[in-house]
């Protein structure tokens, strides 16, 4: 290969790796009765004056009414700020995000879940991550579409569920039912993320961690996750045939750590975005918040601090590199692509000889278009002349590593 070609490859790779997607802003939902009953899954509430009477929130009650901007202002938070600085059952999560350098907001009980609506100052397009901790109100068709478009276009969605029969506002729907309805009953794509929540209720501390050395959720900046503590939670079933990107990272005790059932924590990709899901809200509970609720610290003391590690590593994974490449920060780069954008043919050049592996090309929905086994090739030629213009993802998996890069087809 000529030096000129090597330089071109380096320039192209560098350009794509530095494109920014958006500010690092995280939105915590408070519009789906997250503070109903004995829950208080908000990062901060200055007022406690709403109630849930078999449905949405209404003024007249004692539940947390989270405002858009937490107070005191997050600019005053330091590395030593305690979680009681804000008043909410998941304030520690929010304050940890601020300490990491993120900006956090709450979507109030009367806020709107939209995508691409410029008149909404809290439109999801303004955020990198959307956290929904145990929703208790069904999403509307329009809200489902907005959330799926948010993920498709590079956003990160953190889905927190709870055990079956945990309807807190008395409307007949619990978080397991609501999340499954979101994924299976929408106008965009059925089961887009490749998993569903089971209707279970169990408690355990599990050390059944998937063996994935490069996984950011398990081995991220907050440390190595060695266990997780559930107190009344549920598990998930995976469907890799629907979305090959889905992966269980923590499993129920006694289950296979590589299987498709009994997953306690899951990650997936959809379009350019990412999804993280956990089957219990108690790991996020920091034990302080609404004085009318009985809260327990699962965030710091749960599983000897591992609950916090898992949640913050997952938040970091969702927030980082949600850019136009759509590639995880922890994936090992195994190859270069030339040219990119491409018109007729792509050349994939592995950095080292790949004795055994797989090359795949997928569209923006994660649907596999091309798959080829690799056996020592020094380069791969891919004809893209018949593909529609747009964004695609080229991946090479080899010896336990997977590298993915975005390509653009432009005829």
Task: Spell out what each predicted region is.
Residues 330-411:
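C-terminal outer-membrane/trafficking sorting elements
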Residues 23-84, 99-100, 189, 256-335:
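Extracellular ligand-binding/catalytic regions of CAZymes and related secreted enzymes
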Residues 97, 130, 154-157, 266-268, ...:
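Residue-level detector of buried hydrophobic side-chain packing
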Residues 74-180, 185:
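Helical hinge/lid and interdomain linker segments adjacent to catalytic or ligand-binding clefts
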Residues 29-32, 107-111, 132-136, 160-165, ...:
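Active-site-proximal beta-strand/loop segments in catalytic clefts of secreted hydrolases
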Residues 1-24, 367:
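Bacterial Sec-dependent N-terminal signal peptides
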Residues 27, 105, 158, 191, ...:
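Hydrophobic/aromatic beta-strand patches that form the interior of the parallel beta-sheet core
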Residues 62-64, 68, 163-261, 267-270:
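An acidic, glycine-rich "communication" segment
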